[in-house]
């Protein structure tokens, strides 16, 4: 394979092939459409050759374009190649693949972007795999970032986007269940695909060759199955996080897990203890905000939560002998997850809202269970879990506050609603109503209509309060500390007490919230 030698002066025209053609940079603008790129990358050449373009060194005026006969003609391919599959690739991806192929290298879109495109989903990002090594990739493109050279990854910047381009590689032995001891570059696409986690993620695609499927990924997509590439025990032994990824993909795609893959998960779930909290958090959140958060129950059945969230197992083992419920605390939690929208804070709240029930549970002489004070216990447990999983402080604040107040039965009366909004927070109160609605829908039908009617009434009054702009917090109180200082009040604890008294008065009577009336109220009541 031929590339421009590294370290040559910028702008020099290099002949790495038999022909070198120079074009203005205008003809290779990075924001060109895929069709324009294809036109600019194929030029008539002597002898009927197909002349393809590739970046070398740019002096701001021109780049060197090389020509070569049909690239990689006659390559031997193994496995399934679906010529009928035609995927729509971004212009930047097409350009990168064309440039690499023009210079004698193999290049394909690979992994999740191929999977999602086949399924008609929009990929989050596009990855490219190539036979070129990182330094060869860097020599071909004017703008790159050294993302992870030791793992073979270079990010190519084009059209305002970045695309990770990674050299075919073979992962060495995994000694810690997280990282390979060493990485070896290879010239074999098959060997590169073989190291990937699941068959649906082990497909490659190029516009010229179509779909390359060596391990039955297309068949598993059609059958809606998550299956490991090769021996599942080996795949999970290489990186235990793949155990969580299997369930997460099942939740996101609505797929089942293949029996042999599921069996390996059950056997190797304890190895998840090797995985960092940050990586577990990422996979857990992706599962929770998927269309199937009820897959939490499968994680329990497979022994995953026993390792990463043992508090969930205790909920699954805690009955609720009360007419308000129809299953264990854990079953109720799973049902509640399904009843709330796909939002990280809301789904985390539903997962954690009853974590305190196993500890709070008491049973009376009639056999009925009670969970007095479980809201506060759940808040403390939720905070402990969120910190253990390294969540950010803002998420912890929101989730723990919603958990703390999830069982707060606000009455549908303006004064009560204003006070509740003040206690919970104006930003979180609408979310609290969603939490309470989901909690109610996941309970038994006992008094359900009555509970939902109360929530509807509170929601209606909250909208009216918001539309009228009524004061529900200190920040919208018409009097400030400066006003009190002007009236002779010294800064200190007493000032805070006065402001709190004035706020309480406004929560009872919103018409008091003017500077004049509040100062008069202070003169009468607080001096």
Question: Which sequence ranges carry the predicted segments?
Answer:
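Catalytic cores of the polymerase beta-like nucleotidyltransferase superfamily
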Residues: 1-3, 7, 11-13, 22, ...
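DNA major-groove recognition helices of helix-turn-helix
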Residues: 47
């Amino acid at each position: 394979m031929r590339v421009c030698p590294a370290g040559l002066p910028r702008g020099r025209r290099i002949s790495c092939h038999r022909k070198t053609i120079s074009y203005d940079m205008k003809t290779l603008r990075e924001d060109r459409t895929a069709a324009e790129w294809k036109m600019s990358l194929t030029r008539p050449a002597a002898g009927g050759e197909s002349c393809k373009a590739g970046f070398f060194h740019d002096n701001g005026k021109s780049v060197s374009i090389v020509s070569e006969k049909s690239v990689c003609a006659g390559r031997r391919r193994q496995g399934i190649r679906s010529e009928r599959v035609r995927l729509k690739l971004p212009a930047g991806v097409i350009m990168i693949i064309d440039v690499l192929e023009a210079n004698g290298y193999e290049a394909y879109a690979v992994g999740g972007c191929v999977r999602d495109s086949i399924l008609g989903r929009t990929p989050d990002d596009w990855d490219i795999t190539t036979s070129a090594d990182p330094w060869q990739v860097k020599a071909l493109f004017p703008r790159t970032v050294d993302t992870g050279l030791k793992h073979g990854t270079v990010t190519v910047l084009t059209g305002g986007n970045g695309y990770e381009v990674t050299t075919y590689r073979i992962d060495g032995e995994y000694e810690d269940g997280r990282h390979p001891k060493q990485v070896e570059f290879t010239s074999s696409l098959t060997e590169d695909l073989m190291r990937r986690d699941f068959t649906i993620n082990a497909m490659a695609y190029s516009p010229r060759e179509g779909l390359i499927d060596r391990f039955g990924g297309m068949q598993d997509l059609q059958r809606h199955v998550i299956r490991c590439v090769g021996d599942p025990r080996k795949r999970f032994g290489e990186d235990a996080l793949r155990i969580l990824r299997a369930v997460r993909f099942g939740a996101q795609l609505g797929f089942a897990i293949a029996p042999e893959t599921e069996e390996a998960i059950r056997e190797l779930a304890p190895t998840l203890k090797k995985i960092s909290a940050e990586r577990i958090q990422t996979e857990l959140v992706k599962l929770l905000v998927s269309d199937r958060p009820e897959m939490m129950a499968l994680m329990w059945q497979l022994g995953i939560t026993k390792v990463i969230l043992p508090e969930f197992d205790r909920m699954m083992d805690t009955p609720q002998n009360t007419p308000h419920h129809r299953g264990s605390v854990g079953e109720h939690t799973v049902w509640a997850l399904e009843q709330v929208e796909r939002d990280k804070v809301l789904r985390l709240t539903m997962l954690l809202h009853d974590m305190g029930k196993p500890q709070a549970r008491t049973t009376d002489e009639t056999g009925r269970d009670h969970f007095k004070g479980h809201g506060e216990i759940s808040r403390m447990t939720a905070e402990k879990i969120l910190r253990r999983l390294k969540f950010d402080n803002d998420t912890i604040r929101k989730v723990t506050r919603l958990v703390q107040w999830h069982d707060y039965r606000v009455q549908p009366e303006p004064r009560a609603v204003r006070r509740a909004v003040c206690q919970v927070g104006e930003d979180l109160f609408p979310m609290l109503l969603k939490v309470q609605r989901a909690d109610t829908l996941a309970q038994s039908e006992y008094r359900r209509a009555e509970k939902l009617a109360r929530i509807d009434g509170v929601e209606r009054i909250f909208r009216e309060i918001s539309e009228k702009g009524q004061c529900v917090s200190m920040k919208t109180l018409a009097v400030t500390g400066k006003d009190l200082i002007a009236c002779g009040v010294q800064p200190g604890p007493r000032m805070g007490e006065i402001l709190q008294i004035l706020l309480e008065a406004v929560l009872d009577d919103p018409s008091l919230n003017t500077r004049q009336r509040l100062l008069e109220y202070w003169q009468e009541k607080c001096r």
